[in-house]
Amino acid sequence: MLSRSGSQGRRCLATLSQIAYQRNDDDEEEAARERRRRARQERLRQKQEEESLGQVTDQVEAHVQNSAPDEESKPATANAQVEGDEEAALLERLARREERRQKRLQEALERQKEFDPTITDGSLSVPSRRMQNNSAENETAEGEEKGESRSGRYEMEETEVVITSYQKNSYQDAEDKKKEEKEEEEEEEKLKGGNLGENQIKDEKIKKDKEPKEEVKNFLDRKKGFTEVKAQNGEFMTHKLKQTENAFSPSRSGGRASGDKEAEGAPQVEAGKRLEELRRRRGETESEEFEKLKQKQQEAALELEELKKKREERRKVLEEEEQRRKQEEADRKAREEEEKRRLKEEIERRRAEAAEKRQKMPEDGLSEDKKPFKCFTPKGSSLKIEERAEFLNKSVQKSGVKSTHQAAVVSKIDSRLEQYTNAIEGTKASKPMKPAASDLPVPAEGVRNIKSMWEKGSVFSSPSASGTPNKETAGLKVGVSSRINEWLTKSPDGNKSPAPKPSDLRPGDVSGKRNLWEKQSVDKVTSPTKV
């Protein structure tokens, strides 16, 4: 309910403001119409005065020309006809206006019924009756007096303003006003055209009047006896004309002209002020709208610049991130390459160090006095085999090879042993056979025992003597077995314990040992199946 009452109050205020504006506009239009009507009346009065002056002059000169009364009667009838036509046109215009207003009233009532069905014809019958009464009074007042018609028209305009408060659309009123203005302009043009015709008639009449006057003057000049009469008539005519001018000009035209000028000047000044005010307001509104548009354009330009800056910053950030990522990727690759190269160099260095250690350990591992005795034979094949077996055993212990790979290692050692034995046999076969010493046992049993140990996989167990011990070779066998045990039991990083030096060997026995090794090689050649 409150919202409805508030909306109705706003509507009432809007309608009141609209009514006030329309009333002001209608007042201005009515004042303009009144000014035009007064101007027309003033022109008609001036015409009548001129015609009356012309009639007086024609009556004075009636003794000169008898055709003057006929010519004077024509303008009077023309003026009467013009006045009758103007009154008829005014009445027709008022009738048309009344019909249009009644139509608008009916349309307004229908619209109001559509918006508010509670309104009945009886509630609005009073304004319609009042309008009808006012229209009737207007018609009678226009017929009787023009002043009363003005008041009647004001009342009609007031009723129209009251009725237009119920209207929602003023487009039809604007069209009607435009039509009325066009009709008034056409009527004014017609009046102007009539005035032009009247002016032409007057000019022709003046010309016709001048011609007989000139003829009269010539006739009087011919007659010398009428000079005094001419002077008296001239003085009488001028005196009479002056009296008529004084009678018409101060009494009628003077006061009316001044009053009309004042009445016409005040509305014109007010209209000019209103026009200036409207122009000023329109200029202010246009300037405000222009400023708002300019401000909006500036704000849009600023927003566009900010968006461009943000986009540029985002692009720069993305480029920096991409460059940083590429740099990190390049650094990572460089570090990986450096790490690989360093590891490779470390591996190569360790391999070189291991090779050097392997080369130095058999020679430098023992001191000078603890080095085992080496029998210098022509070829030294048995010592080489022992050194090779020792090297293979060390490599197996260092690399931590499991027992599952022992068979492959043994097969490799066997193949190497076979290669070495074959090489020894090849070298010995080319030499002549020498008689072997009968007192030395065959040392091939120890080699066979070592081979059988590698084949059986019992290298890590203590060797068992399969052959019968001899007193002469006991020291040699003890030295070999002790060295094998040391190879098997010592740690990879531990120092080599010196092998016991056999006490029964002396430098003088070199030749005997030589014969022993030669006998051993001969036995190997003769009995290849045992190997």
UniProtKB/Swiss-Prot annotation:
Q: Where is this region: Disordered?
A: 21-379, 458-531
Which residue stretches does the UniProt record annotate as biased composition, category Basic and acidic residues? 41-50, 93-116, 143-156, 200-227, 271-297, 305-372, 503-522
Q: Where is this region: Tropomyosin-binding?
A: 303-360, 402-412
Impact of changing residue 491 to A on the protein?
Answer: Decreases phosphorylation-dependent actin binding
Gene Ontology terms: biological process? actin filament bundle assembly; female pregnancy; muscle contraction
Q: Which GO terms describe its molecular function?
A: actin binding; calmodulin binding; myosin binding
Query: Which parts of the sequence are annotated with region: Myosin and calmodulin-binding?
Result: 20-200
Mind telling me which GO cellular component terms the entry cites? actin cap; actin cytoskeleton; actin filament; dendrite; dendritic spine; glutamatergic synapse; membrane; myofibril
Q: Which UniProt keywords apply?
A: Actin-binding, Calmodulin-binding, Cytoplasm, Cytoskeleton, Isopeptide bond, Muscle protein, Phosphoprotein, Ubl conjugation
Q: Which InterPro entries match?
A: Caldesmon, Caldesmon_LSP
Result for mutant: residue 462 to A: Decreases phosphorylation-dependent actin binding
Cite the residue spans of the region called Weak actin-binding: 506-531
List where Polar residues composition bias occurs.
54-68, 120-133, 162-172, 459-471
Q: How is it modified after translation?
A: In non-muscle cells, phosphorylation by CDK1 during mitosis causes caldesmon to dissociate from microfilaments. Phosphorylation reduces caldesmon binding to actin, myosin, and calmodulin as well as its inhibition of actomyosin ATPase activity. Phosphorylation also occurs in both quiescent and dividing smooth muscle cells with similar effects on the interaction with actin and calmodulin and on microfilaments reorganization. CDK1-mediated phosphorylation promotes Schwann cell migration during peripheral nerve regeneration.
Q: Does Chaperone appear among the keywords?
A: no
Cross-referenced Pfam families, in alphabetical order? Caldesmon
Cross-link Glycyl lysine isopeptide (Lys-Gly) (interchain with G-Cter in SUMO2) mapped to chain? 384
The organs and tissues expressing this protein are described as: High-molecular-weight caldesmon (h-caldesmon) is predominantly expressed in smooth muscles, whereas low-molecular-weight caldesmon (l-caldesmon) is widely distributed in non-muscle tissues and cells. Not expressed in skeletal muscle or heart.
Which positions bear Phosphothreonine? 468
Q: What does this protein do?
A: Actin- and myosin-binding protein implicated in the regulation of actomyosin interactions in smooth muscle and nonmuscle cells (could act as a bridge between myosin and actin filaments). Stimulates actin binding of tropomyosin which increases the stabilization of actin filament structure. In muscle tissues, inhibits the actomyosin ATPase by binding to F-actin. This inhibition is attenuated by calcium-calmodulin and is potentiated by tropomyosin. Interacts with actin, myosin, two molecules of tropomyosin and with calmodulin.
The protein's name: Non-muscle caldesmon
Phylogenetic placement of the source organism:
Eukaryota, Metazoa, Chordata, Craniata, Vertebrata
